[in-house]
């Protein structure tokens, strides 16, 4: 079952991205390196509720 999640920047707290994930294969929180427009560089974005 795929669910929609939002990804928030760990440094600014901005919620920049919306994506989907499969809860059965990835039960833990997703963590990706994505571009942060405010900082103008790539940072770690974590899944938020």
Swiss-Prot record:
Gene Ontology biological-process annotations: translation
Gene3D superfamilies, per the entry: Ribosomal protein L33
Region forming the signal peptide: none
GO function terms (MF aspect): structural constituent of ribosome
Domain of life: Bacteria
Chain segments annotated as transmembrane: none
HAMAP family, alphabetized: Ribosomal_bL33
Family according to the record: Belongs to the bacterial ribosomal protein bL33 family.
Protein name per UniProt: Large ribosomal subunit protein bL33B
UniProt organism field: Bacillus licheniformis (strain ATCC 14580 / DSM 13 / JCM 2505 / CCUG 7422 / NBRC 12200 / NCIMB 9375 / NCTC 10341 / NRRL NRS-1264 / Gibson 46)
Lineage: Bacteria, Bacillati, Bacillota, Bacilli, Bacillales
């Amino acid at each position: 079952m795929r669910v929609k999640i939002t990804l928030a920047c760990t440094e600014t707290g901005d919620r920049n991205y919306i994506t989907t994930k499969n809860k059965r294969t990835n039960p833990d929180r997703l963590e990706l390196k994505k571009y942060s427009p405010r900082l103008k560089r790539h940072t770690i974005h974590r899944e938020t509720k």
